[in-house]
């Protein structure tokens, strides 16, 4: 038995015996966070936050710094891996009703928002063509805020256009926000262990629990090993798989790319933004696409916690997953028919899922009562 308090805390943590592989993604996210902070530090040592030198400093890291290419690729592809894990983690929470642990869910969505902000600031730092124009388009959405919009945008940019002060403050924010993520992650874990994690059946797990270590810790190691193996294979053989070709050119404010788009993990929100022709409406839809996740614990009306035994909710859940993938795909395409209509239909379906949660719950309750 371990003698150290922290080791004892995790080693003797009582966990339900029947939690499946879908519960492994929390530990995978923790590993991703550690990897991002570590590689990010080594990159920050060699990076220069200046619009004339930023792009050159990335080239210097890749070419001249020992293993700089590996650090840079691990950091860039590690971010994609981070978002893959977090989207699966949220999907598991939606499917198995983990959101009913309200405090944990709220802290988790706050974590998601902080992570998205951090990733956005990081995407701007290489000062490539797509980095610059994605930053211009997204930050310009602040001008849609009534009365305060222009002042807010000028304050964020540090001037009347994206320039050196913008890059400096984005670098500062990208450096400091991971520490906020670490703090929020600690809070998230504390709140989770206060009530205990759910399980696939949605039953009270108190009657059948086992220590986290060695049973679940060894199970977690399998997916962790597979994730790290996948990451290293991509870094070694397909390092540019997630990169945009435009980002291999230095930012040029005088030349607009044919098709401006952010990283793939923001495309679902960008697709929703783009599907609404009004600027303020699009900005509100973009914010609501994330903020609507806060409402789920309060709209759950079903007697059963997970969707395991709720066929209508299962159908809606998998419709949401396919909708999410379709919006992401449509957002990579030009703004022209039929992609405009596809984006509008899928955006409507995305929000419809959250509106139907209470109605489906009541319907399923009535069905069970009649059996």
Swiss-Prot record:
Q: For this UniProt entry, which segments traverse the membrane? A: 25-45, 69-90, 105-125, 170-190, 218-238, 280-300, 312-332, 339-358
Question: Does the keyword Transmembrane helix feature in the UniProt annotation?
Answer: yes
Coiled-coil segments = none
Protein source organism: Leiopython albertisii
The positions annotated for binding heme b b562 are: 75, 174
Q: Which GO terms describe its cellular component?
A: mitochondrial inner membrane; respiratory chain complex III
The entry describes its oligomerization and partners as: The cytochrome bc1 complex contains 3 respiratory subunits (MT-CYB, CYC1 and UQCRFS1), 2 core proteins (UQCRC1 and UQCRC2) and probably 6 low-molecular weight proteins.
> Which residues bind heme b b566 per the record?
89, 188
Which miscellaneous remark does the UniProt record hold? Heme 1 (or BL or b562) is low-potential and absorbs at about 562 nm, and heme 2 (or BH or b566) is high-potential and absorbs at about 566 nm.
Swiss-Prot/TrEMBL cofactor(s): heme b
Q: Name one GO biological process term.
A: mitochondrial electron transport, ubiquinol to cytochrome c
Sorted keywords for this record are: Electron transport, Heme, Iron, Membrane, Metal-binding, Mitochondrion, Mitochondrion inner membrane, Respiratory chain, Transmembrane, Transmembrane helix, Transport, Ubiquinone
Protein name as catalogued: Cytochrome b
Cofactor binding comment, as recorded: Binds 2 heme b groups non-covalently.
């Amino acid at each position: 038995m371990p003698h150290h308090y922290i080791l004892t805390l995790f080693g003797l943590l009582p966990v339900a015996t029947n939690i499946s592989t879908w519960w492994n993604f929390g530990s995978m996210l923790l590993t991703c966070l550690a990897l991002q902070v570590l590689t990010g530090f080594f990159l920050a040592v060699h990076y220069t936050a200046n619009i004339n030198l930023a792009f050159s400093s990335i080239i210097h890291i890749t070419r001249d710094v020992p293993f700089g290419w590996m650090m840079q690729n691990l950091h860039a592809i590690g971010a994609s891996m981070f978002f893959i894990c977090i989207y699966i983690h949220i999907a598991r929470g939606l499917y198995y009703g983990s959101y009913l642990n309200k405090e944990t869910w709220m802290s988790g969505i706050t974590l998601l928002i902080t992570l998205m902000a951090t990733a956005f600031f990081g995407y701007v730092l290489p000062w490539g063509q797509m980095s610059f124009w994605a930053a211009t388009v997204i930050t310009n959405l602040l001008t849609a805020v009534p009365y305060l919009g222009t002042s807010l945008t000028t304050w964020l940019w540090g001037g009347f256009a994206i320039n050196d002060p913008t890059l400096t403050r984005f670098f500062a924010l990208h450096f400091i926000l991971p520490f906020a993520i670490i703090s929020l992650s600690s809070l998230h874990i504390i709140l989770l262990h206060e009530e205990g994690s759910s399980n696939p059946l949605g039953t009270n797990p108190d009657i059948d629990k086992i220590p986290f270590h060695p049973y679940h810790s060894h199970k977690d190691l399998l997916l962790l090993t597979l994730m790290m193996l996948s990451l290293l294979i991509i870094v070694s053989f397909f390092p540019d798989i997630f990169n945009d070709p435009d980002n291999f050119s230095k930012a040029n404010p005088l030349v607009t790319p044919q098709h401006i788009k952010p990283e793939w993990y923001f495309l679902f929100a960008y697709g929703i933004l783009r599907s609404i022709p009004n600027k303020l409406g699009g900005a509100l839809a973009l914010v609501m696409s994330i903020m609507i996740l806060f409402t789920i614990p309060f709209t759950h009306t079903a007697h059963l916690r997970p969707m395991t035994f709720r066929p209508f909710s299962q159908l809606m859940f998998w419709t949401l997953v396919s909708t999410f993938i379709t919006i992401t795909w449509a957002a990579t395409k030009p703004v022209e028919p039929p992609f405009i209509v596809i984006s509008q239909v899928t955006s409507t379906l995305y929000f419809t899922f959250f509106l139907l949660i209470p109605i489906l719950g009541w319907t399923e309750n009535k069905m069970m009562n009649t059996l």
